[in-house]
């Protein structure tokens, strides 16, 4: 009798969970699939489609049965997607690229973030937006923005700033995918140098691949490798941000429990990267993990879009646009200067 009552309680609990979160999760999944469909059939970036479609369904996040599930997608599902990116990372990537190029990439990331903080101050913008935009530009675009946003102290502008950052870096990545091959040809870069330029400067992975292989197989393969090295820096940078922000009293942050010393999704990213480096992750498992990561990130950005009013995004101002454009130009010039110093041409 007791066993039957336990079974009934489990069924009731499951029913409550499904009824609470199910509608919102299903809605974000459906919109994510629509975004992927549009991306595959019309060539638009999937992240951009997910974001715009999410904003169009903003009314679903205001009230009703979908609210809880949308909130879960915007937080837990999104962080699962970031954590699973670790399955793409291995020590072999670092070895295959060479010390000089790796040092250039690390220097570019640090310099871009510092430049973003200084530029934001000159433009009268806050440090939260500076860390968000410069981190996204320096590392891996929308994925980095979502990971960094998860450890920043929250205020009334948090979701607006995240949406703006994802939107701006995705648009700039698409423009770079079109324009940077012209720049590379004008500068007379060879296949490897072109790949380093694309992989070290374009924000999102998909656009890096598109730009690289539009030039040559060598440029595409090198660009992808270089970009994955930048993705490797995501966890260390987010961890450093988290540690620094914990040690500094924050003004204007919403009151709540303190963030953990090491965010769980960052720890999972590092563990998965370690397993992959040790050869403990089968190829099939890695492919499945990356597919789940891609869909989780799409669903997460759909949910973030749903939670944000387009009117509030438009309030961000021209100086914020100038900031992210300046950061994009800065990392491009920095990488090109470093390449010429190292003899890549």
From Swiss-Prot:
<feature type="transmembrane region" description="Helical">
    <location>
        <begin position="320"/>
        <end position="342"/>
    </location>
</feature>
<keyword id="KW-1133">Transmembrane helix</keyword>
<feature type="transmembrane region" description="Helical">
    <location>
        <begin position="262"/>
        <end position="284"/>
    </location>
</feature>
<feature type="transmembrane region" description="Helical">
    <location>
        <begin position="13"/>
        <end position="32"/>
    </location>
</feature>
<feature type="transmembrane region" description="Helical">
    <location>
        <begin position="291"/>
        <end position="310"/>
    </location>
</feature>
<keyword id="KW-0472">Membrane</keyword>
<feature type="transmembrane region" description="Helical">
    <location>
        <begin position="161"/>
        <end position="183"/>
    </location>
</feature>
<dbReference type="InterPro" id="IPR018383">
    <property type="entry name" value="UPF0324_pro"/>
</dbReference>
<dbReference type="GO" id="GO:0005886">
    <property type="term" value="C:plasma membrane"/>
</dbReference>
<dbReference type="Pfam" id="PF03601">
    <property type="entry name" value="Cons_hypoth698"/>
</dbReference>
<keyword id="KW-1003">Cell membrane</keyword>
<feature type="transmembrane region" description="Helical">
    <location>
        <begin position="42"/>
        <end position="61"/>
    </location>
</feature>
<keyword id="KW-0812">Transmembrane</keyword>
<feature type="transmembrane region" description="Helical">
    <location>
        <begin position="228"/>
        <end position="247"/>
    </location>
</feature>
<keyword id="KW-0614">Plasmid</keyword>
<feature type="transmembrane region" description="Helical">
    <location>
        <begin position="193"/>
        <end position="215"/>
    </location>
</feature>
<comment type="similarity">
    <text>Belongs to the UPF0324 family.</text>
</comment>
<protein>
    <recommendedName>
        <fullName>UPF0324 membrane protein RB0971</fullName>
    </recommendedName>
</protein>
<feature type="transmembrane region" description="Helical">
    <location>
        <begin position="130"/>
        <end position="152"/>
    </location>
</feature>
<feature type="transmembrane region" description="Helical">
    <location>
        <begin position="93"/>
        <end position="115"/>
    </location>
</feature>
């Amino acid at each position: 009798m007791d066993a039957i009552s336990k079974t009934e309680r489990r069924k009731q609990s499951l029913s409550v969970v499904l009824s609470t979160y199910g509608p919102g999760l299903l809605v974000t999944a459906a919109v994510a699939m629509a975004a992927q469909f549009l991306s595959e059939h019309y060539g638009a970036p999937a992240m951009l489609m997910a974001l715009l479609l999410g904003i169009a369904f903003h009314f679903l996040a205001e009230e009703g049965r979908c609210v809880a599930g949308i909130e879960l997608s915007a937080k837990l599902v999104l962080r699962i997607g970031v954590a699973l990116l670790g399955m793409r990372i291995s020590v072999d990537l670092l070895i295959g690229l060479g010390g000089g190029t790796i040092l250039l990439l690390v220097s570019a990331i640090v310099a871009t973030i510092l430049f973003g903080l200084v530029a934001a101050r000159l433009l009268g913008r806050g440090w939260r937006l500076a860390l968000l935009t410069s981190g996204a530009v320096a590392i891996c675009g929308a994925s980095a923005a979502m990971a960094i946003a998860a450890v920043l102290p929250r205020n009334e502008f948090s979701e607006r700033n995240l949406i703006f950052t994802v939107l701006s870096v995705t648009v700039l990545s698409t423009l770079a995918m079109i324009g940077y091959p012209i720049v590379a040809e004008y500068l007379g870069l060879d296949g490897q140098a072109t790949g380093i330029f694309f992989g070290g400067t374009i924000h999102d992975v998909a656009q890096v691949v598109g730009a690289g292989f539009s030039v040559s197989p060598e440029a595409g393969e090198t660009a992808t490798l270089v970009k994955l090295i930048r993705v490797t820096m995501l966890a260390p940078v987010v961890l450093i941000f988290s540690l620094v922000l914990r040690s500094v009293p924050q003004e204007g942050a919403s009151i709540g429990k303190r963030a953990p010393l090491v965010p769980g999704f960052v720890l999972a990213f590092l563990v998965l990267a370690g397993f992959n480096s040790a050869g403990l992750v089968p190829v099939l498992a890695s492919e499945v993990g990356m597919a789940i990561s891609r869909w989780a990130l799409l669903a997460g950005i759909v949910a973030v879009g749903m939670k944000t009013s387009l009117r509030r995004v438009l309030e961000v101002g021209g100086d914020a646009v100038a900031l992210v454009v300046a950061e994009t130009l800065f990392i491009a010039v920095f990488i090109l200067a470093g390449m010429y110093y190292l003899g890549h041409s």
